[in-house]
């Protein structure tokens, strides 16, 4: 059952945000199981209450799907004093800064283990929608607290904000190992603050966060409406900024659009550089898929890459999820990934783009690219330029539409299906060792899919 738990958490990691998974799923440990229940160990009572409220059904679902049968979960708190009276989390969040503290000495903590090893600048694909944020992040990583401070990066879910935040941390730790770097989500900041209040260790908490050289905070919008957390983060921000320490923050919204955020915090977020990340365009999605398939060693044919990239999704995480899904199906079934297999597997997610592309559209675009007329593609002229353009158009019709060989032939001047098959196979063979032809077809596909 331990293996089932491990597989279930791996599945959750693929669909949850980096910060949520690291904060709330990673700290949970498998204990034991019986016929109906899986017993899991959590670090604190507050953590248990949070999981009960926000993630219990998620965990039950993940375990049950992975195991192939329904399981319940039982959360066990791993604390020495489980009977101690614990204040309500909301009370702590609102009144936290008024709590009595016990002086505790602590050295600033350098949190490198929380950095995702997969999120580096080398593995980040830069495109028109993210190149400004990418350049700003690299500038900060190479010269912390010297260029843009704070750096505020905002954009929609799954567009690469966490990737850039982690990449900054990796670069600074590699080039300046003497600097203390802490990466955490705003949710984790609140959770650790509440824990410190309950244990009366706010001095230790403040010493940790206010003596850093670099603070990287993900999803700052989480502190919206949380008065006590905003108060504590305000003083943490001031302490670091006054000491000229680097602060980088991400959010799903522009500072002015974050609701229930104190004006003094909002204005501080706007002191430095604000960089946005836009959804990737077609070219960037293609580059991302090629990079991810290389990293994961999932063999993804060119036509499948274009099929995925042309989907309506504007979320990089969803693209990665589709890639992983195809890779898993291919591995489990022992079959290669093909365009037909991808269409069948992902039809509920992205539908079938073939209905949007017609033979006439392909003929029009190919003719324009070769400086020909559409009638030339339908003729029987044997000039080399005509023949190649006609074969490419037929190959694209086979690849990008639902038409049968006879239907395609009918639209190319009444050619029979054997002629269509021959033309398509001719291009298949040529693509294996003709990079120039590959680029021509890639360019035409980009036009068709826009």
From Swiss-Prot:
PROSITE patterns: DNAA. Residues 114-330 are annotated as: Domain III, AAA+ region. Residues 331-450 are annotated as: Domain IV, binds dsDNA. It is found in: Cytoplasm. Its main location: cytoplasm. Keywords: ATP-binding, Cytoplasm, DNA replication, DNA-binding, Lipid-binding, Nucleotide-binding. CDD domains: AAA (cd00009), Bac_DnaA_C (cd06571). GO terms for molecular function: ATP binding; ATP hydrolysis activity; DNA replication origin binding; lipid binding. GO terms for cellular component: cytoplasm; plasma membrane. ATP binds at residues 158, 160-162. SMART domains: AAA, Bac_DnaA_C. One of its GO terms (biological process) is regulation of DNA replication. The keyword Lipid metabolism does not apply. Residues 1-69 are annotated as: Domain I, interacts with DnaA modulators. It comes from the Bacteria. InterPro entries: AAA+_ATPase, Chromosome_initiator_DnaA, Chromosome_initiator_DnaA-like, Chromosome_initiator_DnaA_CS, DnaA_C, DnaA_dom, DnaA_N_dom, DnaA_N_sf. Residues 69-113 are annotated as: Domain II. NCBIfam families: DnaA. Plays an essential role in the initiation and regulation of chromosomal replication. ATP-DnaA binds to the origin of replication (oriC) to initiate formation of the DNA replication initiation complex once per cell cycle. Binds the DnaA box (a 9 base pair repeat at the origin) and separates the double-stranded (ds)DNA. Forms a right-handed helical filament on oriC DNA; dsDNA binds to the exterior of the filament while single-stranded (ss)DNA is stabiized in the filament's interior. Domain I is involved in oligomerization and binding regulators, domain II is flexibile and of varying length in different bacteria, domain III forms the AAA+ region, while domain IV binds dsDNA. Oligomerizes as a right-handed, spiral filament on DNA at oriC. Belongs to the DnaA family. This is Chromosomal replication initiator protein DnaA. It comes from Pelobacter propionicus (strain DSM 2379 / NBRC 103807 / OttBd1). The gene is dnaA.
